[in-house]
């Protein structure tokens, strides 16, 4: 779980799911995050800024994809393992690559905020934001509760345990409908998955 700094003088902050351990073309390693979850200072806390401590900083961003790259503090180990809810089938899965997925593919997402939920990719389309079109999967979650707001950044696994997409946001009127950044588009950012790493 990642959390932002406190907003203003109050005690408000945003928590999101920690993402995937990735490596860029230069061999630098980062953990992905949903970029919109962090203030301009880029400081990342775990579990939150009230009870926790700073564990890293957003050092690179791909704003058109809502993906940020977090460099964790030295000595912190990060492993690409998934949250283990009893209902899910992804417990203990370590994904090896980003997958190319198609309409009709079953996906599963499991995180501390909504537990396990599964659904189907119903389309590959574009979302218009800030006069730019972004490719997304449209997903309908059919098992489990709705995808909660703080699920942003959660990996969506396909039936082979590979990363089909990174969850981005749910429809405000129907939270069972979600949108996710396609795995192949994450690869086009020059990123590949890594099993584990000590920063």
Region annotations inferred by a language model:
Residues 58, 109, 144-145, 174:
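Short, flexible coil/linker segments at or flanking structured domains
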Residues 88, 125-127, 139, 174, ...:
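Generic alpha-helical propensity signal that fires on short helical segments
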Residues 2-136, 157-160, 168:
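Serine endopeptidase catalytic core focused on the charge-relay Asp
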Residues 131-150, 166:
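Extracellular trypsin-like serine protease catalytic domains
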Residues 146-148, 156-199:
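C-terminal subregion of chymotrypsin/trypsin-like serine protease catalytic domains
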């Amino acid at each position: 779980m990642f959390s932002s700094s406190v907003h203003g003088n109050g005690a408000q902050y945003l928590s999101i799911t920690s993402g995937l351990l990735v490596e860029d073309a230069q061999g630098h390693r980062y953990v992905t995050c949903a970029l919109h979850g962090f203030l301009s200072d880029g400081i990342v806390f775990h579990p939150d800024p009230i009870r926790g401590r700073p564990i890293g900083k957003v050092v690179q961003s791909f704003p058109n994809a809502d993906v940020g790259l977090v460099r964790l503090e030295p000595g912190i180990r990060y492993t690409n393992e998934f949250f283990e809810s009893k209902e899910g089938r992804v417990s203990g899965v370590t994904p090896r690559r980003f997958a190319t997925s198609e309409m009709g593919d079953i996906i599963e997402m499991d995180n501390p905020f909504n537990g396990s939920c599964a659904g189907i990719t119903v389309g590959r389309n574009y979302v218009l934001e800030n006069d730019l079109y972004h490719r997304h999967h449209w997903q309908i979650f059919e098992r489990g509760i709705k995808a909660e707001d703080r699920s942003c950044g959660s990996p969506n696994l396909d039936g082979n345990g590979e990363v089909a997409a990174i969850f981005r946001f749910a429809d405000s009127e129907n939270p069972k409908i979600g949108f996710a950044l396609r795995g192949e588009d994450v690869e086009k950012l020059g990123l590949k998955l890594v099993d584990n790493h000590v920063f």
